[in-house]
Amino acid sequence: MTESQSYETRQARPAGQSLAERVARLVAIDPQAAAAVPDKAVAERATQQGLRLAQRIEAFLSGYGDRPALAQRAFEITKDPITGRAVATLLPKFETVSYRELLERSHAIASELANHAEAPVKAGEFIATIGFTSTDYTSLDIAGVLLGLTSVPLQTGATTDTLKAIAEETAPAVFGASVEHLDNAVTTALATPSVRRLLVFDYRQGVDEDREAVEAARSRLAEAGSAVLVDTLDEVIARGRALPRVALPPATDAGDDSLSLLIYTSGSTGTPKGAMYPERNVAQFWGGIWHNAFDDGDSAPDVPDIMVNFMPLSHVAGRIGLMGTLSSGGTTYFIAKSDLSTFFEDYSLARPTKLFFVPRICEMIYQHYQSELDRIGAADGSPQAEAIKTELREKLLGGRVLTAGSGSAPMSPELTAFIESVLQVHLVDGYGSTEAGPVWRDRKLVKPPVTEHKLIDVPELGYFSTDSPYPRGELAIKTQTILPGYYKRPETTAEVFDEDGFYLTGDVVAEVAPEEFVYVDRRKNVLKLSQGEFVALSKLEAAYGTSPLVRQISVYGSSQRSYLLAVVVPTPEALAKYGDGEAVKSALGDSLQKIAREEGLQSYEVPRDFIIETDPFTIENGILSDAGKTLRPKVKARYGERLEALYAQLAETQAGELRSIRVGAGERPVIETVQRAAAALLGASAAEVDPEAHFSDLGGDSLSALTYSNFLHEIFQVEVPVSVIVSAANNLRSVAAHIEKERSSGSDRPTFASVHGAGATTIRASDLKLEKFLDAQTLAAAPSLPRPASEVRTVLLTGSNGWLGRFLALAWLERLVPQGGKVVVIVRGKDDKAAKARLDSVFESGDPALLAHYEDLADKGLEVLAGDFSDADLGLRKADWDRLADEVDLIVHSGALVNHVLPYSQLFGPNVVGTAEVAKLALTKRLKPVTYLSTVAVAVGVEPSAFEEDGDIRDVSAVRSIDEGYANGYGNSKWAGEVLLREAYEHAGLPVRVFRSDMILAHRKYTGQLNVPDQFTRLILSLLATGIAPKSFYQLDATGGRQRAHYDGIPVDFTAEAITTLGLAGSDGYHSFDVFNPHHDGVGLDEFVDWLVEAGHPISRVDDYAEWLSRFETSLRGLPEAQRQHSVLPLLHAFAQPAPAIDGSPFQTKNFQSSVQEAKVGAEHDIPHLDKALIVKYAEDIKQLGLL
């Protein structure tokens, strides 16, 4: 899933009065609100069956008569004191136009157009308009309907090339333009032969700028020899008032299918295309489905509708607000300036009862809040912060908001919660589209108009309707408000409908409950980076947009790169505080990093660098659509070249920095080189890399750690194992200390190269001689050491915080504590206290009984020492080493660096040299039997029938290859440990018990105790998260049916008990045990899936294995990072083909099974069969740990 995927649920409605109570209170004390209550009788007359759209509009406008319909800011003509020019100065009040006056103005315009002597316009022709929403614009738009014209509202941010293309496609007879956009209109009209009239609206008589704009337009047209007639709308209305009203459009054969409106989409993915609105669809804006589709769920029809409209009529949202208010008898107030600079002033004057916001407006409100906090030095949540919210609500937003909604684009839960906290009302989440109409309200389908829906798999992004726990995919719907398609674009229309007639929204959603959806992302907003990671650009922008320093941000990426860039517009406050240079860039970088940490984003989701843009993205500069959405093609067109150059510069800088680090390393402190190398390889600034930071905290993983290790080795000529770099106990300062220690000691410790030869591709048992690892004195004394103690009272355990190690610690404590004995464990940590805390944490899985049991035993018989078994003397203080050499009776070496990707050379230090250090302690002062935990991977490369369970490993596997096979390095390193212990047995008679485990499964009793990183847990999690499994994990029989197969795994509780019991008996000799499950019981992966399905987990089977694997991988890549990290994706190559169907274990387990039976280990006194209870517990434990 995307986000287990934990989809945010809607916040509870803010506490307080119900909507009905708030409406009643406001109406009782506010005459304007009382006068704006809808009239049911008007609505019934206007929406009766059989009325054409023009008749419906006329019924509303005449029905509400003298009520105020529209309001615009009043202004006065003043003289500019500097230029002396006549300018318009806004006054702190609005002037209104009544419904009756609006109808008369619209009729006058229609009459003048129809009866013009030189260029009459008739029904069926097109009228294009461009401008900011206003009284004039509304009048002209309604006039078009009365005359039977097809309206083509154009986006004010469109380029002239786009405008000309649309005009060419629609061939308008009339072009209406506001003064602000008159120049573009003239350019378009000159290129469009069909245009006969150019109407200028929002013309302010007496304002020099407006007069000059109209004169310039007439001059340009005249000079070009154009016959286009230019009139102001006021002139048209004045002439039209003297003319008879035009007859409303009569019924036609097309009826309400007549084309009434074309809404051209923003073109966020390319050339705009005109969505066709027949009359019946436009009618839904006027008291129809659109009107109440996004109202609050408990709204009553008597909510007074007073709104401020800032949305353009070229966008559906602008029409919803305007026409919805006009069909409710309310008043629409228009924002005074298109750049929204008067936003708060207009709202405080208008005092709306209903709000409709888009995320861009909510972000603006949030930034105002943040700026006020910064100005007074207050913190969020403080009394001063609440006072700012109160001022926002009561003064700047008018103080009488009853309902509020948001739409046009998804909004983050955090921003939603903030707006609700300001307004103290529920913010309705409305989702719809230009083509389909309203789709959901507060995530629940709006029915009607939606009649059917389905989710369509998006395999390339990993979204499937079979996903668990929620189906995901592209939302496809059938709806009563669906449009017939795109104007003159039959091919494009066909692309957005499937073969069953469902409209393809292009939006990926998750169905979290029946007919309840959560938006995931636009299908085209997801980018795959070069390393295979998917990033959702719009989600990242929403997250980073909450920064108090970010005004706007556009995240940029390329599938040829492994990281992201961005274009960032800082807030005015940020620019005022930091300037527009490196200071603001540094502050922004810190802010983005902080948000990334808070949001749990991955390193590749954080822009590595960005361009600072001081000019905001606007409609005017073409970066924003009329609805305020960032147009990615426009961003790419404007900044793409600079961003690609930045990519090249970063790559060159990294290469140069690495060269610089190499050249001057000998003259710098080691820690400086370590920091700079980490910064260069991980794309960070060296100044920002703290020496106390852990490599993984900087975004590093095991593979980047390998690159880092090799680079440091190249510089310092000492081994810097990956185990040192990725150790939870180590930071960069620790890495530097390791290097300094290795350099000062002369690095005489054994290495892969000194033992096997540099660049060796095969390794031999004969290479691994004790004299290469242990000092001559220890080896000389070993053969004559006292024999092991007759009674085991003190056990030394390594790897106790590992998966098996924790239960070995528990098992030994259970045995020794009642006898007064103790268990000593070595754990990495900066000191003993930190080491103890690391061990304690592995028992905190959510099972209080386990934790209490461990703590009780630990208090009585556990000693924790900070150390590292791969270091000299196990990383212990000399006094502790000497004491343990005297006290310890038996050593259990469970510790290892378990990594199935790293090569043998990188695992040589922790796993081979570490085992030699254990052998050294076992051969000091007196012999101490060793229990050694090995792996089934040791058997790789040897025929199963030839792999002798209790044979001499030096003969059974004398020569091994080094290759890139799965777990080759790990298997070789554990094999080498076995060889060394066999050498110690042969040299000094050291008793050894080797246990080679295959899959060690979850604990059958304790909650949450499973090995999250192992392949089996990853597979179960992945099956549950994706909801798909193959028909069979094994090769099918000749008829295509499933075959009996067996899964070789043993629960950890039994494994620990068996190893402890058999290890305790190992006071002499050398014996090996293959800890496998040998039963021929037909219990395999297919049965595990059966059991999960029977337990109610939704998993669908895919018949074709290759198809399943492809879908499975795609789904896994689409999981949220927290799940993807723990999925089987890194190990998916193990499932590349169906496995052979083997019912039983291919390896010999006779020695282990007979020893278990003889010692009566476990309740069954035998190796247990796997059962349904354990597999179902896996699912429960995975959920318990928060991974689903």
Curated annotation (Swiss-Prot):
Note accompanying the cofactor annotation: Binds 1 phosphopantetheine covalently.
UniProt KW Ligase keyword: no
Database matches in Pfam families: AMP-binding (PF00501), NAD_binding_4 (PF07993), PP-binding (PF00550)
O-(pantetheine 4'-phosphoryl)serine, modified sites: 702
Gene Ontology biological process: biosynthetic process
Catalytic activity: a carboxylate + ATP + NADPH + H(+) = an aldehyde + AMP + diphosphate + NADP(+)
Residue ranges the record marks as coiled coil: none
Molecular-function GO terms, alphabetical: ATP binding; long-chain fatty acid-CoA ligase activity; NADP binding; oxidoreductase activity, acting on the aldehyde or oxo group of donors, NAD or NADP as acceptor; phosphopantetheine binding
SMART domains per record: PKS_PP
Domain of life, per lineage: Bacteria
Cofactor: pantetheine 4'-phosphate
Annotated EC: 1.2.1.-
Phenotype for residue 1015 to P: Loss of activity
UniProt: AMP binding residues: 315, 408, 429-430, 434, 507, 519-522, 528, 629
Entry binding sites for NADP(+): 801-804, 828, 838, 868-869, 894-896, 934, 970, 974, 997
EC supergroup of this enzyme: oxidoreductase
Protein role: Catalyzes the ATP- and NADPH-dependent reduction of carboxylic acids to the corresponding aldehydes. Catalyzes the reduction of a very wide range of carboxylic acids, including benzoic acids, heterocyclic, phenylacetic, phenylpropanoic and fatty acid substrates.
Domain notes for this protein: The N-terminal domain likely catalyzes substrate activation by formation of an initial acyl-AMP intermediate, the central region contains the phosphopantetheine attachment site, and the C-terminal domain catalyzes the reduction by NADPH of the intermediate thioester formed from the attack of the phosphopantetheine thiol at the carbonyl carbon of acyl-AMP. Large-scale domain motions occur between the adenylation and thiolation states. Phosphopantetheine binding alters the orientation of a key Asp, resulting in a productive orientation of the bound nicotinamide.
PANTHER family: AMP-BINDING DOMAIN-CONTAINING PROTEIN-RELATED, LONG-CHAIN-FATTY-ACID--COA LIGASE
Family that this chain belongs to: Belongs to the ATP-dependent AMP-binding enzyme family. Carboxylic acid reductase subfamily.
Protein name from the UniProt record: Carboxylic acid reductase
Species per Swiss-Prot/TrEMBL record: Segniliparus rugosus (strain ATCC BAA-974 / DSM 45345 / CCUG 50838 / CIP 108380 / JCM 13579 / CDC 945)
